[in-house]
A protein has these predicted regions:
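N-terminal Sec-pathway targeting helices
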Residues: 1-18
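Short acidic/proline- and small/hydrophobic-mixed sequence motifs that coincide with surface turns
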Residues: 93-98, 142
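Hydrophobic beta-strand segments
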Residues: 99-103
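Short, solvent-exposed, Trp/other aromatic-anchored flexible loops in extracytoplasmic proteins
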Residues: 110-146, 150-154
Length: 164
C-alpha cells in the first residue's frame, strides 16, 4: 500500500510539473513585429494584373478583402500597389502554426490582395510576411497592420503602425 501511495504522489507531482511547463509554453507564446517596410508601385507598371483585379471585382470573383467597390474605375495610373513587408519573430519554444496580416484601410483604399500561402514560424525564428493593398495614387503609406497568429489552434494578435 505504501508503494502505491508513493507512486500516486509521484504521478500527481509529475502531472503538475507537466501542466506548469505546458502552461508556461502557452502563456509565453509571443510573436513580435521587429520591422515594417513599405513600397509603393504604380498599378500602371503591371497593367495586366490591374485589369485582372478590376475584372474580378466587377464580376464578384475577387479573392481577398474588398474594402470598397469603386463605382467608376479610373485609369491604372491613378492607383498604387502598397506592399508592406513585416519582419516577425517567434519568441516561443513552440512553432507558430499560421500567421496572417490585415491592413486596416483608410477611406479610399480599394482592396487587399488575398494570399493563399500558409505561413508559419518555427520555434525561436524570424520570418517575413508580405501584404499588398490597392489604393489611390495620392495616398500616404501610414497604415495600422494587424498580425494574427495561431498556436495550438488558439489565436493571438499584434497591432503595429507603419509610418507616422
Amino acid at each position: 500500500m505504501k508503494g502505491l501511495k508513493i507512486a500516486a504522489i509521484a504521478s500527481v507531482s509529475l502531472l503538475l510539473v507537466m501542466l506548469v511547463l505546458v502552461g508556461y509554453l502557452f502563456l509565453t507564446a509571443e510573436v513580435q513585429v521587429m520591422d515594417v517596410s513599405s513600397q509603393g508601385i504604380s498599378a500602371a507598371s503591371n497593367f495586366e494584373r490591374f485589369e485582372q483585379l478590376k475584372a474580378s471585382v466587377i464580376d464578384g470573383t475577387f479573392q481577398g478583402t474588398l474594402y470598397q467597390k469603386p463605382r467608376d474605375w479610373k485609369e491604372a495610373s491613378e492607383y498604387v500597389y502598397l506592399t508592406y513587408t513585416i519582419r516577425l519573430r517567434n519568441n516561443c519554444l513552440v512553432p507558430i502554426d499560421m500567421v496572417e496580416a490585415q491592413v486596416v484601410p483608410l477611406s479610399g483604399d480599394i482592396l487587399q490582395i488575398g494570399s493563399f500561402d500558409v505561413r508559419s514560424l518555427d520555434l525561436k525564428s524570424e520570418g517575413d510576411l508580405t501584404v499588398q493593398i490597392l489604393a489611390p495614387k495620392d495616398t500616404h503609406p501610414v497604415r495600422e497592420l494587424i498580425v494574427t497568429y495561431y498556436l495550438w489552434g488558439v489565436s493571438g494578435s499584434v497591432k503595429t503602425l507603419y509610418g507616422n
